[in-house]
Amino acid sequence: MPLSSDCALLVIDAQNGFMPGGGLPVAQGDAIVPVINRMAPLFENAVLTQDWHPASHVSFAANHPGRQPFDVIELPYGPQVLWPTHCVQGTPDAALHPQLHVPQAQLILRKGCRPQVDSYSAFTEADRTTTTGLAAWLHARGIRHLYLCGLATDYCVAWSALDARAAGFAVTVVEDACRAIDLNGSLARAWADMNAAGVQRASSQGLLAD
């Protein structure tokens, strides 16, 4: 049964760059695509996000001589994990997965566009002061409850879920429609933070059975 019109599906970074063979592959990342496609028709409203980095982006290890991917450096806004080069603007790596099918999506939000600031969350950049405008866009359309899925659970999904709660939305993470990087315990920490913030968990099977 379709969910009410005050619900929206938020698909986080279902891009080639996070799939097997991509610049920053998440294990089994491609397994989420058919799950998202099956549950997408439950939603009248949907938003997709897209990591969209310039080649000079501060989060790329390649832009820091002597550093390796997954090193952590200090930036003016705090600790920054250095990543393999991924999702560079206009490249196939940055494209949405070709089999992703969410035709009712009303917005594609591109994030991580500024060279000197990373952006995991769909709502607020990593400096924690620059907002993307998504919360206001959703509030203006009467959205009250967000269902999150995508990549990766412990980074962009979790940061988006926490910021959505802070912005006043009910939030449910659809677990089987996500996969994690799990860097040094990051998945357990992310779930602890999300649980503390009141983020709910669900499965796509549960949603489809309701």
Ranges and model annotations:
Residues P2-L9:
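Extreme N-terminal starter segment of soluble prokaryotic enzymes
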Residues I12, Q50, E175:
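Active-site flanking residues adjacent to catalytic metal/cofactor-binding acidic residues
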Residues P20-Q28, A122-A126:
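Short glycine-enriched, charge-decorated loop/helix-capping segments at active-site entrances
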Residues P34-H145:
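Active-site alpha/beta core segments
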Residues I36-M39, Y155-G168:
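Histidine-anchored nucleotide/phosphate-binding helix
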Residues L109-G112, V174, A202:
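Hydrophobic residues at beta-strand termini and immediately following loops
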Residues V173-L187:
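Short, flexible loop segments at boundaries between secondary-structure elements
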Residues Q200-A209:
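Short acidic-hydrophobic, aromatic-tinged amphipathic segments that line or gate anion-handling sites
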